[in-house]
């Protein structure tokens, strides 16, 4: 579905690929939401 497509496109978003956190992307409202990635970078970056 659309969420699955959003997951695939996550890897193409700069905020997601920084420091290899692309797999932490969350699909929200059929769009890639990188907010969780930013939070992880604050804690582990």
Curated annotation (Swiss-Prot):
Localization per Swiss-Prot or TrEMBL: Secreted
Identification of the protein by name: U1-ctenitoxin-Pk1a
State which tissues express it: Expressed by the venom gland.
Q: List the molecular function annotations (GO) for this entry.
A: toxin activity
- Notes concerning its domains: The presence of a 'disulfide through disulfide knot' structurally defines this protein as a knottin.
Which cysteines in this chain are paired by disulphide bridges?
3-16, 10-25, 15-34, 27-32
Q: What is its main location?
A: secreted
Keywords of this entry: Disulfide bond, Knottin, Neurotoxin, Secreted, Toxin
**Domain of life, per the record?**
Eukaryota
Any one GO CC term of the record = extracellular region
Similarity annotation? Belongs to the neurotoxin 02 (plectoxin) family. 01 (Tx3) subfamily.
């Amino acid at each position: 579905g659309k969420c699955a497509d959003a997951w695939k496109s996550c890897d193409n978003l700069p905020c997601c690929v920084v420091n290899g956190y692309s797999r932490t992307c969350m699909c929200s409202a059929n769009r890639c939401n990188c907010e969780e990635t930013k939070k992880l970078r604050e804690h582990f970056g």
